[in-house]
Amino acid sequence: MQVSVETTQGLERRLTISVPAEQIENTVKEALKSEAKRARIPGFRPGKVPVSVINKRYGSAIRQDIMGEVMQRNFVEAIIAEKLNPAGAPTLTPGSTEGENFEFVATFEIYPEVELKGLESITVEQPTAEVTEADVDAMIETLRNQHATFEVADRAAAEGDKAKINFVGSIDGEEFEGGKADDFELQLGSGRMIPGFESGVEGHKAGEEFNIEVTFPEDYHAENLKGKVATFAITLNEVQAANLPEVNDEFATLFGITEGGIDALRAEISKNMSRELEQALKANVKEQVLNGLVEQNDIELPTALINGEVEVLRKQAMQRFGDQAANMPELPADLFTEQAARRVKVGLLLGEVIKTNELKAEDERVQGLIASMASAYEDPSEVVAYYNGNEELMQNMRNVALEEQAVEALLKTATLTEKAVNFEEFMNKATGRA
């Protein structure tokens, strides 16, 4: 086998591989003989079909299969010999089969050589927060509102009430699509409508007709409404006041607390909020570290890896549409290209961090991650056992642990400053509610 390597552009390589034609011919002959022994052809006894008949019937297909096998096998041998690391499947193009040698071309991309830079220039503002009794009180109030009952009230609408309304929206005197509804039920203060709409209903009684003027946000999803001033003609049909459950031991049973009453509920809420806070704090620091790593290191990315990641993201996006996905056109690749490229870049850079620091997933950390995740379930021990019995899930958790360890390694050389933050504000921002 003879091999020549050519750099076509960037990470793309072209291998021209030459294999003795005799090697292929001998393999074809053996394959024809083997097929002749197995073939069942009318007019010939089993195992007695002449090779010439087999060649006439199946020779072309057999030769194509063998050429494919020869190309694949010799490609693997060539990249090992040339110490090349393909980033994707090669395109194999057969050349001439005449003469003494069979020549083919393999075109593919290789992984880039990654040399980490600027790790000392990464800056991280490390948020610190804790769950206070006031935060637990606020969560209990949220739970009370979620379990509220409503009854018709003969008074002006206020925040927390439900209002049934008819409304017609217009811009410059013209109604717009989607701006009209009858008997629309809205909980005031929920933030469901654009700013100013819900507060504009407050203070009015059932039977009143009135107008409110609001401005659509600049980032509103409908392009034709962004930043526009609209007038809504509203009829308030009914006001319903909320009846909130009392905070007592009976209230605690709504959340599976059978012993310890409201004190046990508060302890459980505090534990869950603390777990969510810890996860959000770690995610915030991780995002800053990765942003810094990406900014400090500019590397060439294999198109094959980006395309593969695009397909993963596209599939995930389609799955979120559920049954509707079957009736939808395929989402265009350019919707995901930027995110896919970042994922590939982060993966390559973290891989080098792991390699440089000789990191291996720590068993204790892996089990800690599983235990933390399982604690959110009714029977944590069952979840832990399930994970430990599933190698694919365990490998996923090892990868998460390795990523954590890589981020911690980067933090050792980064510049850190602590900043105290408010629990509610931080969590709202972390979950996109800010």
UniProtKB/Swiss-Prot annotation:
The UniProt record lists the keyword Cell inner membrane: no
Coiled-coil annotated spans: none
Keywords (A to Z) from UniProt: Cell cycle, Cell division, Chaperone, Cytoplasm, Isomerase, Rotamase
Catalytic activity: [protein]-peptidylproline (omega=180) = [protein]-peptidylproline (omega=0)
EC number: 5.2.1.8
Keyword Cell division: yes
Gene Ontology biological process: 'de novo' cotranslational protein folding; cell division; chaperone-mediated protein folding; protein transport; protein unfolding
Enzymatic class: isomerase
Predominant place of localization: cytoplasm
Subcellular location: Cytoplasm
Family of this protein: Belongs to the FKBP-type PPIase family. Tig subfamily.
Function as written in the Swiss-Prot or TrEMBL entry: Involved in protein export. Acts as a chaperone by maintaining the newly synthesized protein in an open conformation. Functions as a peptidyl-prolyl cis-trans isomerase.
Domains (record comment): Consists of 3 domains; the N-terminus binds the ribosome, the middle domain has PPIase activity, while the C-terminus has intrinsic chaperone activity on its own.
HAMAP family documented for this protein: Trigger_factor_Tig
Name of protein: Trigger factor
